[in-house]
């Protein structure tokens, strides 16, 4: 998917955290591409003939190109997808607010927002009381090593529960004049801080 949708620019992930996060746990093995295992799991679920679903995609190229690749991979194991290319307003209304979708692709780029998984009303509707308790405990914990352990446990929970198919961290490619100084090498937020730029 990274090669086909992003021309090789991207880093595989297996959970909601990016690899540069100090508490990142490499769980990429949980979501390896394995068509034979997929067919076996479908058969165990009583869906050996496959099924049909929707794939609603927002405008960015990672979603549109990634969606075509994923639809092809799903088709190979018997899952037919109806792709709908949506504008952002449609995606927000149908998927994010309306929760009316089978599958979607979207980049979660907000830093440290793993707590969204403790909200059953969030668009992917994960409702795990154990995870919710863990997030409540995390929010009341200040000890860095305890927080780190909790964040690692949280990543394992959502990855093992397959809340989402974690694909890759988007590359943040930019071009800047060589004379410009002070730009961040890696962006910790979605904003570009120009206060130290000269």
Where are these regions (language model features)?
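Immediate post-signal peptide segment of exported/extracytoplasmic ligand-binding proteins
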Residues: 35-54
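Short, well-ordered beta-strand elements
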Residues: 50-59, 82-84
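Positively charged, proline/Ser/Thr-rich regional signature most characteristic
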Residues: 22, 33-34
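Detector for C-terminal structural segments
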Residues: 1-25, 62-71, 89-198
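DNA breakage-rejoining catalytic core of tyrosine-based enzymes
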Residues: 27-33
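Residue-level recognition of alpha-helix initiation/capping sites
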Residues: 33, 58, 64-65, 86
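Short phosphate-binding/catalytic loops that engage adenosine nucleotides
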Residues: 79
């Amino acid at each position: 998917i990274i090669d086909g949708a992003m021309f090789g620019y991207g880093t595989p992930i297996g959970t909601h955290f990016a690899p540069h996060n100090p508490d990142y746990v490499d769980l990429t093995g949980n979501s390896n591409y394995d068509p034979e295992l997929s067919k076996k799991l479908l058969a165990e679920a009583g869906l050996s003939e496959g099924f049909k679903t929707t794939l609603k995609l927002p405008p960015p190229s990672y979603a549109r190109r990634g969606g075509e690749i994923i639809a092809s991979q799903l088709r190979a194991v018997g899952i037919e997808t109806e792709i709908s290319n949506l504008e952002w307003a449609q995606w927000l209304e149908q998927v994010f607010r309306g929760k009316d979708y089978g599958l979607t692709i979207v980049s979660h780029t907000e830093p440290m927002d793993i707590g969204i998984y403790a909200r059953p009303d969030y668009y992917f509707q994960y409702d795990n009381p154990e995870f919710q308790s863990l997030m409540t405990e995390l929010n009341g914990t200040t000890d860095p090593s305890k927080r780190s352990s909790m964040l690692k446990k949280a990543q394992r929970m959502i990855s093992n529960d397959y809340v989402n198919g974690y694909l890759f961290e988007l590359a943040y490619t930019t071009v800047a004049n060589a004379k410009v100084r002070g730009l961040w090498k890696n962006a910790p937020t979605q904003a570009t801080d120009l206060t130290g730029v000269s």
